[in-house]
Amino acid sequence: MDDSKVVGGKVKKPGKRGRKPAKIDLKAKLERSRQSARECRARKKLRYQYLEELVSSRERAICALREELEMYKQWCMAMDQGKIPSEIRALLTGEEQSKPQQNSSRHPKAGKTDANTNSLVGN
């Protein structure tokens, strides 16, 4: 008996399944593969450059934070000895100078809030 099968009105002969490979020029295929490899290496290089920049920026941030922490430790040690560091003194005097300006603008608002709280307490 014949090994050919009838499927959908067409006669199929036994043999390899799927698409037959097109007759591709091997040199072109090899060149495409090389180009793909070049692009892959370029992407990898860019990714590593980005990661190295990220690491160095994080290391710089860590150094800055360590310096800031050391400064705060020094301030605490000075305050434990009863000394007020000049930086803190400058911060405090800067706040005291800005407080009168803020307080004068806050008084009308504070009066309104006091009136509102008094009305709530009375209920």
UniProtKB/Swiss-Prot annotation:
Q: Name one GO biological process term.
A: protein stabilization
Which GO terms fall under molecular function for this chain's record?
DNA binding; DNA-binding transcription factor activity
Q: Does the keyword Acetylation apply?
A: no
| Compositionally biased residues, Basic residues | 10-21
- Where is there biased composition of kind Polar residues? 114-123
Name the coiled-coil region(s).
Answer: none
Q: Where do the record's region annotations for Leucine-zipper lie?
A: 62-69
The PTM entry states:
Phosphorylated by AMPK.
Q: Where is this region: Disordered?
A: 1-24, 92-123
- A Pfam family matched in the record: bZIP_2
Q: What induces it?
A: Up-regulated during preadipocyte differentiation (at protein level).
Tissue expression, per UniProt?
Widely expressed with higher expression in adipose tissue, skeletal muscle, and liver (at protein level).
Ranges for domain bZIP: 23-86
Keyword line: Activator, Differentiation, DNA-binding, Nucleus, Phosphoprotein, Transcription, Transcription regulation
Gene3D superfamilies, A to Z? 1.20.5.170
Q: Where in the cell is it found?
A: Nucleus
A cellular component term, taken from the record's GO annotations:
nucleus
Q: Signal peptide location in the record? A: none
This protein's assembly is summarised as:
Interacts with CREB1; regulates CREB1 phosphorylation, stability and transcriptional activity.
Q: What is this protein called?
A: cAMP-responsive element-binding protein-like 2
Q: Which organism is it from?
A: Mus musculus
Its encoding gene is what? Crebl2
